[in-house]
């Protein structure tokens, strides 16, 4: 099975890693698309850790803009949707794997639905209050075809 995994920041990759590792052990083809903070000098170019872990980065999509945070996330989401559309068209995955409640997950859910790809959403049930992440997470869960919550074991 061909899997596209979108990750934009070290904190989500840390959670995705064991899932990706198990998928790799099961001989699935994993295509990682790195975006956002992974590609930033300010955040220590954490995409290099993905490579060090033995995963192939199929595409890098630069979405960080030097504007205020609200404008940056909104415009960056637009850039991510455009770039991810090209990646999905070229790679033709069986499904798209995303985690959480950031712009990466909503972008992947939108692209996956418009391009008739299954969307698997991890960690959709973890509430965060006081910012846009909560409604984004709920929207991604609605758009996802498979929804996985984490359990203690």
Identify the residue ranges that each predicted region occupies.
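N-terminal subdomain of nucleotide-sugar transferases
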Residues: 1-38
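Helix N-cap/beta->alpha junction signal
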Residues: 9, 101-102, 150-153
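Short N-terminal targeting/anchoring amphipathic segment
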Residues: 86-102
